[in-house]
């Protein structure tokens, strides 16, 4: 709530790589990042979405199209796809606020925007009338599958309305989890859905970039459920590899 209540100022050191923001220092729920680093903002590397608000230490940065696609910092929110154009209008000293919306609302806004572009007629959307308090009370986890004797824990988190982050296991470095991520990526490449745009693996995670207007989240989640049921036990996993001979 502190993040969404604050009025942020655009830092002078901003570009297409990222828009730095000046505002209140966050109160962290932990003292450090565990295995990932000394600062509480540190996590094991996972993929970033364009428009993600990335806390590099205590300063948030809105990652732009020329920003990193992978990194080791926490990201509490992501600018929705329909509002990405606004990032290009910001300049040093501008003030802004973030307003949380549901995935369904984000898709409605994107669909309305597409209709506006094609019909050249404008329909206004009142963000403040969309139930902000209700959104803040929702968990950022849309699905969690507990670990069993043959499977790892899986957590699904949206990153904005066009990206889905899939995380395996606990927050530890484990080559088994990396293998599981790679196996899922290979399965999705073999069984691709129309609307999946890009797959970006991390250490223990995989981010799926998809077109929400062509591929609803519910359909993507059903596809991922099928993937988990078809993937082999990680102990029996066999992945292609290669030998490189150096001169």
Where are these regions (language model features)?
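Glycine-rich active-site loops that engage anionic ligands at enzyme catalytic sites
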Residues: 1-247
């Amino acid at each position: 709530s502190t993040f969404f209540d604050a009025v942020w100022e655009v830092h002078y050191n901003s570009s297409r790589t990222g828009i730095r923001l000046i505002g209140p220092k966050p109160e962290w729920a932990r003292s450090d990042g565990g295995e990932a680093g000394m600062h509480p903002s540190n996590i094991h590397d996972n993929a970033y979405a364009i428009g993600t608000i990335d806390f590099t230490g205590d300063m948030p940065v809105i990652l732009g199209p020329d920003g990193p696609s992978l990194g080791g910092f926490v990201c509490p929110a992501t600018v929705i796809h329909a509002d990405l154009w606004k990032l290009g209008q910001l300049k040093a000293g501008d003030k802004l606020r973030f307003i949380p919306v549901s995935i369904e609302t984000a898709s409605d806004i994107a669909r309305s925007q597409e209709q506006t572009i094609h019909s050249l007629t404008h329909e206004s959307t009142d963000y403040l009338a969309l139930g902000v308090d209700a959104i803040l009370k929702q968990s950022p986890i849309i699905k969690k599958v507990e670990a069993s004797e043959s499977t790892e824990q899986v957590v699904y988190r949206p990153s904005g309305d066009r990206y889905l982050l899939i995380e395996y296991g606990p927050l530890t470095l484990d080559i088994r989890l990396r293998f599981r991520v790679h196996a899922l990526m290979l399965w999705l490449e073999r069984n691709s859905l129309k609307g999946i745009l890009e797959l970006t693996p991390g250490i223990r995670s995989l981010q799926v970039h998809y077109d929400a207007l062509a591929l609803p989240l519910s359909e993507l989640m059903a596809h991922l459920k099928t993937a988990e049921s078809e993937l082999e036990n990680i102990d029996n996993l066999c992945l292609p590899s290669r030998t490189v001979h150096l001169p």
